[in-house]
Amino acid sequence: MQVDADLRPILGPQLVRLDPMRVKQLQDPIVYEAIDNLAKLSAHCLQLRTPLTTCEKLINSDSTLYLSWKYDEEEKVSRLMGFAKVGRKKLFLYDSQMQTYEGEILCLLDFYVHFSCQRQGVGQQILDYMFSQEHTEPYQLALDNPSVTLLGFMSQKYGLIKPVWQNTNFVVFEELFLALSAENGIEKPPPDGWRRPMTPRRLGTGMTDTRWLQHAVSGHQSKGNAMAAPVDADMTPQGALSNRAHQAKARKAHILSSKPLW
């Protein structure tokens, strides 16, 4: 993405971290337009109607943009080569054994390298710089609805070959869950603030299996005192519809029997 201006006084180094405050302080329409146009190319590659990244969205969010650019001394132009947008989100994740984890994790929300700069190491330079600034390891990163190309990139550059898809379209890697337990005597640190809930929820093929603790509410028709306690509630689709119909009739009867307020 070419800009007919010298952006060195505005952006500074060729790898730059732009948090919302820094983006707002730029106050340069040329830079704003260049970043927005680069984000439009990213959206076009993903076949999206609207771009995921704009300077306006960055200013009004908690996301951070890592931008790679350079100044061409011969042609006297600046070139924006690529970017990565990241942000921290609280996620509920499931490993391959359907055990649940929750916590705040760094998410890659948008990632793009200009077609004229691809296969030149620009993408890895951006992510390596981002990892160093965010104090995060590659296996601790979550990907927001990644493309096959991005998954292949993470596999080739960082050796992350076992993606675990989530029902929220986020993807994490198996190493994230292995970090919570010692494997072969080597323990990797999990992301800050991560923990495994005491009542994990398992999502299968349309069914939700919840394991309750010993001190679960007694007497509740769908909660027992012991783990794996039998459930006597009618959980079939027909039963659920019948329960909702009965509740609707009860509410209607209550409304009709109530005294008017006027």
UniProtKB/Swiss-Prot annotation:
Expressed solely in touch receptor neurons. One of its GO terms (cellular component) is microtubule. One of its GO terms (biological process) is microtubule cytoskeleton organization. PROSITE patterns: GNAT_ATAT (PS51730). Belongs to the acetyltransferase ATAT1 family. Its EC number is 2.3.1.108. GO terms for molecular function: L-lysine N-acetyltransferase activity, acting on acetyl phosphate as donor; tubulin N-acetyltransferase activity. It comes from the Eukaryota. Keywords: Acyltransferase, Transferase. It comes from Caenorhabditis elegans. The keyword Ligase does not apply. It catalyses: L-lysyl-[alpha-tubulin] + acetyl-CoA = N(6)-acetyl-L-lysyl-[alpha-tubulin] + CoA + H(+). HAMAP family: mec17. This is Alpha-tubulin N-acetyltransferase 1. It is an enzyme of class 2 (transferase). InterPro entries: Atat, GNAT_ATAT. Disruption phenotype: Mutants are partially insensitive to body touch. Acetyl-CoA binds at residues 111-124.
